A protein has these predicted regions:
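Phosphate/nucleotide-binding beta-alpha loop and adjacent structural elements of enzyme active sites
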Residues: 1-147
Length: 147
């Protein structure tokens, strides 16, 4: 996909190609196939949730985040950056349900401007489970796990 190729170029340009691995899958609550609506205005706004986009659609494979990490033999995530246009609750609730608290990511950077698309408020859950706000930007929030 164009977005993935652009992302890979940025990773290589910034010399992070040894530390960052990309996957051509989406993350969600279960293994399934979903339609991704491609935004012609802003590729980063392509969405599974917002099907009102007057755009082309492609089918993508969705995997639970815990399954993807297990497959890649990643047992602990220290920093999680997630920007999935309103699908954050679908990806994060199932992931946290599989974890012992000692394996929770230390930092999470996530978009919080799509809360109206969430079925459950993942931020409220994260705050109730030990996270606090470290910083906020336009549309994003950086939270840290209190020790």
């Amino acid at each position: 996909s164009i977005v993935l190729e652009r992302f890979k170029e940025n990773i290589k340009f910034n010399k992070f190609d040894k530390q960052i691995k990309t996957f051509q899958v989406g993350v969600g609550e279960k293994r399934e196939i979903k339609e991704l609506c491609l935004s012609h205005v802003d590729m980063g706004s392509s969405s599974i949730v917002n099907t009102n986009l007057n755009s082309d659609k492609v089918k993508i494979k969705i995997l639970p985040l815990s399954e993807l990490l297990k497959k890649e033999e990643i047992s602990k995530v220290d920093v999680l950056k997630i920007d999935i246009e309103g699908f954050e609750d679908k990806a994060l609730f199932p992931y946290f349900k599989t974890l012992n608290k000692k394996f929770y990511p230390r930092l999470i950077l996530m978009e919080d401007s799509s809360q109206s698309d969430w079925d459950e408020n993942i931020l409220e859950w994260l705050f109730a489970n030990g996270y606090r706000i470290l910083a906020r930007t336009r549309g994003n929030i950086l939270i840290t796990l209190e020790k």
